[in-house]
């Protein structure tokens, strides 16, 4: 289950191999990535100014459609 959209200070940059997420906020954020094909993505805590790497869109065009808040303590 995904939460609400993340704040505008959290951005993602996608390529075919990796999706890098940057936290430009003043506080740590818990983020997961939503994909076109509904692929599962982990919940990662990103410290202020920090980065996290998720899967890219690959050869089948499984693009990132958005970032959402999540609870890192909840097993999926």
Swiss-Prot record:
GO terms for molecular function: alpha-amylase inhibitor activity. Gene3D superfamilies: Alpha-amylase inhibitor (2.60.40.20). Keywords: Alpha-amylase inhibitor, Disulfide bond. Disulfide bonds join 9-25, 43-70. Inhibits mammalian alpha-amylases specifically but has no action on plant and microbial alpha-amylases. This is Alpha-amylase inhibitor Z-2685. The lineage of its organism: Bacteria, Bacillati, Actinomycetota, Actinomycetes, Kitasatosporales.
């Amino acid at each position: 289950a995904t939460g609400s959209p993340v704040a505008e200070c959290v951005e993602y940059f996608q390529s075919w191999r990796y999706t890098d997420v940057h936290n430009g906020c003043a506080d740590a954020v818990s983020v997961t990535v939503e994909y076109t094909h509904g692929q599962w993505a982990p919940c990662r805590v990103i410290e202020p100014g920090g980065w996290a790497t998720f899967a890219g869109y690959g050869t089948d065009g499984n693009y990132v459609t958005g970032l959402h808040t999540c609870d890192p303590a909840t097993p999926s």
